[in-house]
């Protein structure tokens, strides 16, 4: 037995000697192992039984390997497995490899890429980093579906020729056909997609999209050809031209530029969209409409940061038409804001900000002439100073605001210089926390053409000294005897001010009518901003009680001032304010109840119930709102609505359903609702969503939106939206392509 082993070792040594010694200058030598190694009459090396060839971190496994020394080829007549240096696995038969393993050709290839994607075909030819597969099929799906007697992946791409570029990481397919559930869904003569092995961005065309638009008996088409530019490691541009044609409509083009850049200490992003119809006859105007959205953020140094946020459009509603899902579509006005912020300039906690603000209306019923321009707004917070427990701070502010036309609220032009001084002292006495707070405003206004009534305008300079002082106390204690570990915290606050009512000669530029809530009831100035002052003398009292998962809070105010502006604007007719309260219970579920109760008229002016849970069914949210028009001077109608939503847990492993809606109990209609289904496995996703929006105007019909989207791993998403009101109204059926993060797909 030992003699047999010695012979085997001798043969192995001879093989290694003849393979390595003649070419020792070549760094990529191969090693051959097998149960049996022999030579044929042509001095070819024949390895049988568990044969292996190693070259650096590449390996070939087979039951029979023949090495042709003269041609320097590795012949593989039977089934074999090859692992390359990138951990990709190849299976095949009846083929050969060059000695350096860079060139190969074999039948029935089966390739498993290192991300789990698969490629199979009839024949493969490997030239360096290029794999050319004849009659190939590509799919990233691991799961299989049985349809009749056929077992197939969820989806796959079939190509007459598939070329996989392992170096530039592109997948080229000729005469490509996609099958979903073994059903052909589309054909394209030539398609280029990023390789599933891609880890870095590359420039190139993305999947084009085709849209069919049906208008009565006419049909028009639009096509887009997105191209991605990988400009640099920190810069990218997506250019998408869209062409509309046919159906008797004007030929037009839309061009979208989406540019992103990472800069030192920040980022820059801009989206440019413009429409053109330069193909029309007798047309001398190539640009019809456009929008430009820009975001720029940069830390200039350790103390300063600059931010630019801009949205511009050439006509009203253009962004609403081109970007209906963007938050900008729902704003009354677009803005261009330039902010320069400074930190830790003189003190560690000071803060400096300069803002330039320009606005543009975004709604048909808005007048651009009353939209303000802020040039500039400057604020400087000097930081806190603490002297023996006395904490004080100061804020200096200046603004210059102007517009074309004034109204009852806003002047044509106004400048303000304001100094705010804040003083606070806290004491712990008698088991209570006692706080003393003082705010003193010194302000100078220069106002031009402020409309008082009808054609009566006022212009002038005004000085205002407005102090507000308060003393407050709270005394928490625990009830151990009756309610074990129940904490009770009563609170009392006395606030006094000059009592001077806000003048209608001043333009209100930065104050808004805040709701009367638990969040601001103890504030000294309950208005946001300081153009309007809370001219109130009042006492505020409340009590909080909490234990573990239960918390309750109740508060009320008594006004000593008859002409308290904030008190009146919040719908309070007498000295006693409404009672406001909140009850919250949170454990596995969260239930909150907020209310505002009018004590004089004995009715709930506002109540809101919120319930949310995350259980075995899914995430459920239900919100009920009942609000009277007297809550403030902005709300003009009574409101009673129910808002609801459900996002289910996954069922059947990959499926989810969702629905949501807003039901108007006053009008007994669903103002909006939607229902959707989604399926996402490890390689394929589908979304089907239906949404309806109703309008208060009788002449406006409900808007129905049905959206179908397919998502394919490593390929992207294709979305179709159908807006349909009736058979005779316009219907848009459009397929759009989207990039998709592969993290959306489940790896269960």
Where are these regions (language model features)?
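Classical Sec-dependent N-terminal signal peptides that target proteins to the secretory pathway
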Residues: 2-27, 65
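Short secondary-structure boundary/capping segments
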Residues: 3, 322-328, 505-510, 570
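Sec-dependent signal peptide cleavage junction
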Residues: 25-40, 728, 737-745
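A structural signal for short, well-ordered beta-strand segments and their strand-loop junctions
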Residues: 172, 238-240, 269-271, 353, ...
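Long, intrinsically disordered low-complexity regions enriched in Ser/Pro/Thr
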Residues: 337, 359-361
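Outer-membrane beta-barrel translocator/pore domains, especially the C-terminal barrels
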Residues: 125, 132-135, 163, 189-190, ...
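Structural signature for solvent-exposed beta-strand/loop edge elements and short helix-capping sites
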Residues: 28-336, 454-455, 632-635, 652, ...
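Long, charged, glycine-rich C-terminal linkers/tails
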Residues: 208-209, 357-359
